[in-house]
Amino acid sequence: MSIFIGGAWPYANGSLHLGHIASLLPGDILARYYRAKGENVLYVSGSDCNGTPIAIRAKQEGVTAKEIANKYHEEFQRCFRDLGFTYDCYTRTDSEHHHETVQKVFLRLLEEGYIYKKTVEQAYCETCTQFLPDRYVEGICPYCHEAARGDQCDACSAILDPLDLLEKKCKLCGSTPSVEETEHFYFALHTFQEQIKKVVEIVKEKGTWRDNAIQLTERYVKEGLQDRAVSRDLPIGVSIPVKGYEDKKIYVWIEAVAGYYSASKHWAEETGKDDQEFWNSDAQTYYVHGKDNIPFHSVIWPAVLLGIGEEAIPRHIVSNEYLTVEKRKLSTSKNWAVWVPDILERYDPDSIRYFLTVNAPENRDTDFSWREFIYSHNSELLGAYGNFVNRTLKFIEKYYGGIVPKGSIEVELKDKVEGLYKHVGEAIEQTKFKVALETIFDAVRFANKYFDEKQPWKQREDDPVSCEETIYNCVYLIANFANLLEPFLPFSSERVRSTLSIIKRNWEPQNTLPSRIDSVQPLFERIDVKQIEHEVGKLYGAVK
């Protein structure tokens, strides 16, 4: 089976925060799981280096857009690597390859008659002497009356045009823009109305899109899909490949989602492999992003794929809700965020991955609290999982000289482990990652109870053979926990496998156990709860 996984492309205009990771982490869990199953996986993403936010940030700082993009693209790569993300291709939208691929997509849509020219009115800033596309205009959403950008309202998810906004202001200078006529290319989105409607009916029946994606897309379809501009007067981006229009750029909403396609083609060129299997109707496709990106993946990208004759429309949309921080809405402008480069300096990446999975905003907004983060690490990772692994392996080291005693796997435990692979796998495939991880940790707590009830410290004196059986079965559980937890907690899983000299990562019960263990080290360290006050103080600016 061919599995294509696309992670949303973060704007390279500032550091990643935990809100980004909360929405993107499911992609890596899926990729690791399907690879362990032996499936053919292509997992791609990249940095959005062409968007308006980069141009605005560059102008504000008095540097080039390229300098801003380079800085954050490199930082993103480090953060994703340090968090254990296993992209097969992580690229950038200002690469020559991406530009060429997107231009081919544009020309194909033009040739098929899905793109046409139209004279329209557009916001124009007299002070900056330039047209103001999408995010260059800010104001009030006409639907919910919350603050919004010219491309979309985060509060109600409405897709907007800058002229839709009330109380419009130029993002660069704050002046009120005028309205001027200009010519742009438009995508005939309305022609895909019935096809998109059919797609939504199918995924709703199968339950393969998150509810928020289904509900929002149903709303768009009910209102009637509207044609959208595919060109903008932007300083950076992919140039329109039509003579006389080279100064205009392909609008980011079509250019960015086409990044999945360009990354796939780039991977194929780099590896010498064929990527077409990921774009046919048999491919299982997963698109992983936050709810603010739903319309781009549930309406626009399927329409583009249909327009260029590709069959692999989004089978699964994994669109998480928002993550708040200490009960407040995350705000990068107010520095109310937990920044990824910062948290990685002091905390285990598996602790971050664990918390953002068991507290994932899968169906509703959830909160990141430093108190809950640190207590979950100490009680679950250290107190439950780490404790079971450490007490078992230290017992072997102390009483058996590092030699794993011989024994046979208890039928009850074997059945339990086989059931875990089945149920956890099903939950992952259904994008219920929280359920999957909680199911494993229920088994971890069962394992600790098993150890306590068997009392190997007493068995060693009273019944040495039973003690060996107990420890052998505990090693069996540990080996399989490492396998089962690998998609979620790859770093600690690798440490366990190294200690047990286990190489295989297949998604199936690990029945062959090692004869000895090497260098037992604590799987996790306790975090001092005094850190809670320190971290919250930093967030409020009281601590530097």
From Swiss-Prot:
Binding locations of ATP: T332
Sequence positions that bind Zn(2+): C141, C144, C153, C156
Gene Ontology biological process terms in this record: methionyl-tRNA aminoacylation
Top-level taxon in the UniProt lineage: Bacteria
InterPro entries assigned to the protein according to its UniProt record, in alphabetical order: aa-tRNA-synth_I_CS, Anticodon_Met, Met-tRNA_ligase_1, Met-tRNA_synth, Methionyl/Leucyl_tRNA_Synth, MetRS_core, MetRS_Zn, Rossmann-like_a/b/a_fold
Cellular compartments annotated: Cytoplasm
Reaction equation(s) it catalyzes: tRNA(Met) + L-methionine + ATP = L-methionyl-tRNA(Met) + AMP + diphosphate
GO cellular component: cytosol
Motif 'HIGH' region per UniProt: ranges: 10-20
Pfam families linked to this entry: Anticodon_3, tRNA-synt_1g
Keyword Aminoacyl-tRNA synthetase in annotation: yes
EC number: 6.1.1.10
Cofactor annotation comment: Binds 1 zinc ion per subunit.
Motif 'KMSKS' region mapped to chain: 329-333
Alphabetized Gene3D superfamilies for the sequence: HUPs, Isoleucyl-tRNA Synthetase, Domain 1, Methionyl-tRNA synthetase, Zn-domain
Reported function: Is required not only for elongation of protein synthesis but also for the initiation of all mRNA translation through initiator tRNA(fMet) aminoacylation.
Subunit structure: Monomer.
Homology family: Belongs to the class-I aminoacyl-tRNA synthetase family. MetG type 1 subfamily.
Name of the molecule in the record: Methionine--tRNA ligase
